[in-house]
A protein has these predicted regions:
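Conserved, well-structured core segments that form or line functional sites
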Residues: 2-215
Length: 215
C-alpha cells in the first residue's frame, strides 16, 4: 500500500471551524510519554492545494530513545534515515517498512535527544469511513504522507501541522506497544495510548482505562 501524493478528499477539514489551534514548539519538547498521551484527541493535518486534510489522533506509541530497545535510536543508532529523531521537538520522522508502508512519527524533546511518538491511528471528519486511518500505514496512505516529509517541521507555516482541541478529553487506555516483541523488557512497557471509544483504533490489546491528559 504505497501512500498517494494527494490526501483523501473526504479528510478535508477547517481547523478554525473545529475550534483547533496549532501546537507550539513547547508542546513537543516535553516528556515523550506526556506528548504521546496528549496527542490523543489532537488532529494531525496536511495542507494540500490550499486546504487542510486531517484526522483526530486516537492511538499513539511512545519511543524513548537510546535506552529503549524498540526505538530506532536504540543505543544511539544514528543513520540518515533516523537523523530527524535527533532534531528539535515538532519535526516529522517518516520511515518506510516492508517495501510498501509509511509510518509517521512526531519527534519530541530537544535536539540531540532522539525520542518520538508513532501515530498509530486517527479518525477523519464526519462522513469519512471509520477505519480509513486505522493503523500507521493506513493513516499515512489516507493523508498522502511519504518519507519525503521526513524532517519537515510541524511548527510554523509548513504544510503539516498538529492542531490541539479545547474540547473534552477522551477516555484514554494504556497498554504495551504492538509488534515490538524483539525489544526484551521494553516490549512490556506501557507506552501505547488509545481512545477507548474510537472505532479507528488499530488493535484492541488490553489496556488500563484512564481519563484526561498526562500529569
Amino acid at each position: 500500500m504505497i501512500a498517494k501524493i494527494a490526501p483523501d478528499s473526504r479528510l478535508r477539514i477547517d481547523p478554525a471551524a473545529l475550534g483547533l489551534e496549532a501546537a507550539a514548539r513547547s508542546f513537543f519538547r516535553r516528556d515523550t510519554v506526556a506528548v504521546a498521551r496528549d496527542l490523543i484527541g489532537a488532529w494531525f493535518a496536511r495542507r494540500y492545494r490550499g486546504y487542510w486534510h486531517g484526522g483526530r489522533i486516537v492511538e499513539t506509541e511512545a519511543y524513548l530513545g537510546p535506552g529503549d530497545a524498540a526505538a530506532h535510536s536504540w543505543k544511539g543508532r544514528r543513520t540518515p534515515r533516523v537523523e530527524p529523531m535527533y532534531g528539535d521537538g515538532g519535526l516529522l520522522y517518516v520511515f518506510f517498512v516492508y517495501g510498501m508502508h509509511h509510518c509517521a512519527n512526531i519527534v519530541t524533546r530537544k535536539p540531540g535527544d532522539p525520542q518520538a511518538v508513532l501515530l498509530r491511528a486517527a479518525e477523519g471528519p464526519e462522513g469519512s469511513p471509520a477505519r480509513l486511518m486505522s493503523g500507521p500505514a493506513r493513516l499515512c496512505a489516507a493523508l498522502g504522507v511519504t518519507k519525503l516529509a521526513s524532517g519537515l517541521d510541524l511548527v510554523g507555516s509548513g504544510r503539516y501541522r498538529i492542531f490541539l482541541s479545547s474540547g473534552a478529553r477522551p477516555l484514554i487506555a494504556v497498554s504495551p506497544r504492538i509488534g515490538v516483541d524483539y525489544a526484551g523488557d521494553a516490549a512490556g512497557w506501557p507506552l501505547r495510548f488509545f481512545d477507548r471509544e474510537s472505532r479507528a483504533v488499530s488493535g484492541r490489546a488490553s489496556g488500563k482505562r484512564r481519563a484526561g491528559p498526562a500529569s
